[in-house]
A protein has these predicted regions:
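Residue-level hotspots at or immediately adjacent to binding/recognition sites across diverse folds
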Residues: 1-232
Length: 232
């Protein structure tokens, strides 16, 4: 979070404690893989923990651009950010720049079926297949609305964004279709678990889909506040 804030829970999320962090820069995303947590944020900041989030160190970052999202897949961390920046690492401690096909801001990144997918401003969607995030191509996007989050489940990618936008791909992120949304509120995060996609956003809006993202319904939300992420 803000000012390098990192908090940790060891009781299944019942209570959290502050953790000492090596940065005062705002951190915007966190991922986990190979027994390593990696968090990314403004000014290209990347920090890592190899002891279940108890202690953190700065990782080597090749960029000063904001990094807004990170995911782990195929033994690789991939983070994305402003100006189309994409960075990758095999260990979480040292990252390298990857050639990006776009210069628009990338905000969210997901992984599934050996494919990385990143989404961002103006409906931008890019993907990397079979080479652990080393090479990226543009995907066909059906929207010009900003996209903020992307998730994979049951052989489908789902991305969400401005004005209730929901788009879906069933061919490893190559082509995408608009999906009817029950809201015009901005959707910021999306996650998958128990055969269900859940999206959340402004005004406490929560949506769910139980048919691989093909149709969506409003869920009962206990808050009018903005929701920025969904995890499972």
């Amino acid at each position: 979070g803000d000012n390098g804030t990192i908090v940790k829970s060891t009781d299944k999320g019942l209570s959290f404690d502050n953790v000492t962090t090596p940065t005062s820069n705002t951190l915007l995303g966190v991922g986990f893989g190979n027994n390593t947590f990696v968090a990314v944020g403004i000014s290209g900041n990347i920090v890592e923990s190899n002891d279940n989030g108890t202690t953190w160190d700065n990782a080597t970052s090749p960029t000063a651009n904001y990094l807004r999202g990170i995911v782990f897949g195929n033994n690789t961390f991939v983070a994305v950010g402003d100006s189309g920046n994409i960075v990758r690492s095999d260990n979480g401690s040292s990252f390298d720049n990857v050639t990006s096909p776009v210069t628009t801001h990338l905000i969210g990144v997901g992984f599934g079926n050996s494919t990385f997918v990143a989404v961002g401003d103006n409906g931008t969607i890019v993907r990397s297949t079979t080479d652990n995030g080393s090479n990226w191509d543009n995907a066909t996007s059906p929207t010009t609305n900003n996209l903020y989050g992307v998730s994979f489940g049951n052989n489908a990618f789902v991305a969400v964004g401005d004005n209730g936008t929901i788009v879906r791909s069933t061919d490893n992120g190559s082509t995408w279709d608009n999906v009817t949304s029950p809201t015009s509120n901005f959707l910021i995060g999306v996650g998958f678990g128990y055969n269900t996609f859940v999206a959340a956003g402004t005004y406490g809006n929560i949506l769910r889909s139980t048919d691989n993202g093909s149709s969506w319904d409003n869920a009962t939300s206990p808050t009018p506040n903005q929701l920025r992420g969904v995890g499972f």
